[in-house]
Protein backbone atom coordinates (compact mmCIF):
# COMPACT_ATOMS: atom_id res chain seq x y z
CA UNK A 1 0.00 0.00 0.00
CA UNK A 2 1.33 3.44 -0.93
CA UNK A 3 1.96 5.82 1.93
CA UNK A 4 0.03 9.06 2.16
CA UNK A 5 2.00 12.06 0.95
CA UNK A 6 1.97 15.41 2.69
CA UNK A 7 1.92 18.31 0.22
CA UNK A 8 3.85 21.30 1.55
CA UNK A 9 6.22 24.03 0.53
CA UNK A 10 9.94 23.76 1.20
CA UNK A 11 9.53 26.44 3.89
CA UNK A 12 6.93 24.30 5.67
CA UNK A 13 9.21 21.24 5.49
CA UNK A 14 12.09 23.29 6.89
CA UNK A 15 9.85 24.39 9.79
CA UNK A 16 8.90 20.77 10.52
CA UNK A 17 12.58 19.76 10.49
CA UNK A 18 13.39 22.57 12.93
CA UNK A 19 10.54 21.49 15.22
CA UNK A 20 11.74 17.86 15.03
CA UNK A 21 15.27 18.91 15.92
CA UNK A 22 13.94 20.84 18.94
CA UNK A 23 12.00 17.79 20.12
CA UNK A 24 14.95 15.43 19.71
CA UNK A 25 17.74 17.64 21.01
CA UNK A 26 15.96 19.66 23.71
CA UNK A 27 12.59 18.27 24.80
CA UNK A 28 13.51 14.56 24.76
CA UNK A 29 16.62 15.02 26.97
CA UNK A 30 14.66 17.30 29.33
CA UNK A 31 11.99 14.63 29.79
CA UNK A 32 14.58 11.90 30.32
CA UNK A 33 16.18 14.05 33.03
CA UNK A 34 12.78 14.64 34.68
CA UNK A 35 12.15 10.88 34.71
CA UNK A 36 15.58 10.29 36.25
CA UNK A 37 14.91 12.86 38.98
CA UNK A 38 11.42 11.47 39.66
CA UNK A 39 12.83 7.94 39.98
CA UNK A 40 15.21 9.19 42.65
CA UNK A 41 12.18 10.02 44.83
CA UNK A 42 11.65 6.31 45.44
CA UNK A 43 8.33 4.44 45.29
CA UNK A 44 7.08 4.80 41.69
CA UNK A 45 3.58 3.50 42.47
CA UNK A 46 2.57 6.82 44.05
CA UNK A 47 5.00 9.15 42.33
CA UNK A 48 3.00 11.79 40.46
CA UNK A 49 6.15 13.48 39.12
CA UNK A 50 7.22 10.19 37.56
CA UNK A 51 3.76 9.61 36.04
CA UNK A 52 3.67 13.14 34.61
CA UNK A 53 7.16 12.80 33.14
CA UNK A 54 6.29 9.42 31.56
CA UNK A 55 3.12 10.96 30.07
CA UNK A 56 5.16 13.83 28.66
CA UNK A 57 7.70 11.36 27.28
CA UNK A 58 4.92 9.49 25.47
CA UNK A 59 3.63 12.77 24.03
CA UNK A 60 7.09 13.90 22.86
CA UNK A 61 7.85 10.52 21.28
CA UNK A 62 4.46 10.59 19.53
CA UNK A 63 5.15 14.07 18.15
CA UNK A 64 8.57 12.92 16.94
CA UNK A 65 6.98 9.99 15.07
CA UNK A 66 4.35 12.24 13.49
CA UNK A 67 6.93 14.78 12.32
CA UNK A 68 9.29 12.11 11.01
CA UNK A 69 6.45 10.61 8.95
CA UNK A 70 5.39 13.98 7.54
CA UNK A 71 8.98 14.84 6.63
CA UNK A 72 9.68 11.40 5.13
CA UNK A 73 6.56 11.56 2.93
CA UNK A 74 6.66 15.29 2.19
CA UNK A 75 5.64 16.21 -1.34
CA UNK A 76 7.30 19.55 -2.02
CA UNK A 77 5.04 21.86 -3.99
CA UNK A 78 6.86 24.49 -6.02
CA UNK A 79 4.47 27.41 -6.32
CA UNK A 80 6.71 28.81 -9.07
CA UNK A 81 5.81 25.78 -11.23
CA UNK A 82 2.17 26.89 -11.57
CA UNK A 83 0.87 29.96 -13.37
CA UNK A 84 1.53 33.20 -11.51
CA UNK A 85 -2.21 33.91 -11.11
CA UNK A 86 -3.25 30.32 -10.27
CA UNK A 87 -4.22 29.33 -6.73
CA UNK A 88 -1.94 26.62 -5.30
CA UNK A 89 -0.13 25.67 -2.12
CA UNK A 90 2.29 28.46 -1.28
CA UNK A 91 0.06 31.21 -2.67
CA UNK A 92 -1.85 34.03 -0.98
CA UNK A 93 -5.35 34.60 -2.32
CA UNK A 94 -7.60 37.64 -1.96
CA UNK A 95 -11.27 36.80 -2.54
CA UNK A 96 -14.47 38.81 -2.45
CA UNK A 97 -17.84 37.27 -1.74
CA UNK A 98 -20.10 37.79 -4.75
CA UNK A 99 -22.76 40.44 -4.14
CA UNK A 100 -21.01 41.92 -1.10
CA UNK A 101 -17.97 43.98 -0.25
CA UNK A 102 -16.68 41.25 2.10
CA UNK A 103 -13.06 40.38 1.30
CA UNK A 104 -10.85 37.71 2.84
CA UNK A 105 -7.21 36.79 2.39
CA UNK A 106 -6.04 33.19 2.66
CA UNK A 107 -2.55 31.72 2.62
CA UNK A 108 -2.85 28.19 1.18
CA UNK A 109 -0.44 25.80 2.91
CA UNK A 110 -0.04 22.07 3.37
CA UNK A 111 -1.99 20.57 6.26
CA UNK A 112 1.15 20.55 8.42
CA UNK A 113 1.48 24.34 8.20
CA UNK A 114 -2.16 25.28 8.75
CA UNK A 115 -2.83 27.99 11.35
CA UNK A 116 -6.25 29.59 11.02
CA UNK A 117 -5.31 32.38 13.45
CA UNK A 118 -2.66 33.66 11.06
CA UNK A 119 -4.78 33.11 7.96
CA UNK A 120 -2.94 29.95 6.86
CA UNK A 121 -5.47 27.40 5.65
CA UNK A 122 -4.80 23.77 4.82
CA UNK A 123 -4.95 22.62 1.22
CA UNK A 124 -7.38 19.99 2.57
CA UNK A 125 -9.89 22.58 3.83
CA UNK A 126 -13.18 23.18 1.97
CA UNK A 127 -12.13 26.75 1.15
CA UNK A 128 -8.80 25.67 -0.33
CA UNK A 129 -10.45 22.82 -2.24
CA UNK A 130 -12.76 25.34 -3.89
CA UNK A 131 -9.92 27.75 -4.73
CA UNK A 132 -6.99 25.55 -5.81
CA UNK A 133 -6.55 25.53 -9.57
CA UNK A 134 -8.62 28.67 -10.10
CA UNK A 135 -7.15 31.91 -11.43
CA UNK A 136 -7.59 35.63 -10.87
CA UNK A 137 -11.09 36.63 -12.00
CA UNK A 138 -12.55 33.12 -11.61
CA UNK A 139 -15.53 32.37 -9.42
CA UNK A 140 -15.42 29.59 -6.84
CA UNK A 141 -18.24 28.04 -4.83
CA UNK A 142 -17.34 27.43 -1.21
CA UNK A 143 -19.31 24.91 0.82
CA UNK A 144 -19.72 25.79 4.49
CA UNK A 145 -21.89 24.52 7.35
CA UNK A 146 -24.07 27.62 6.88
CA UNK A 147 -24.52 26.84 3.16
CA UNK A 148 -22.63 27.51 -0.02
CA UNK A 149 -21.53 30.90 -1.31
CA UNK A 150 -19.57 32.22 -4.26
CA UNK A 151 -16.39 34.23 -4.19
CA UNK A 152 -14.45 35.96 -6.92
CA UNK A 153 -10.68 35.61 -6.88
CA UNK A 154 -9.35 39.17 -6.83
CA UNK A 155 -5.62 38.42 -6.70
CA UNK A 156 -3.14 35.58 -6.31
CA UNK A 157 0.43 36.11 -5.11
CA UNK A 158 3.28 33.88 -4.04
CA UNK A 159 3.53 33.70 -0.25
CA UNK A 160 6.93 34.69 1.08
From Swiss-Prot:
Tagged with keyword Coiled coil: yes
Residue runs in coiled coils: 1-72
One MF term in the entry's GO annotations: DNA binding
PANTHER family (alphabetical): TRANSCRIPTION ELONGATION FACTOR GREA
Family named by the database record: Belongs to the GreA/GreB family.
NCBIfam families: greA (TIGR01462), PRK00226.1-1 (NF001260), PRK00226.1-4 (NF001263)
HAMAP family: GreA_GreB (MF_00105)
Protein's name according to its UniProt entry: Transcription elongation factor GreA
Record lineage: Bacteria, Bacillati, Bacillota, Bacilli, Lactobacillales
Amino acid sequence: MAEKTYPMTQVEKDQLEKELEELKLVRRPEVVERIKIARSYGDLSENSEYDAAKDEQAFVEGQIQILETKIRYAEIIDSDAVAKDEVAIGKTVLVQEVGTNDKDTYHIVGAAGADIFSGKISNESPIAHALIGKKTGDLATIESPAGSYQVEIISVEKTN
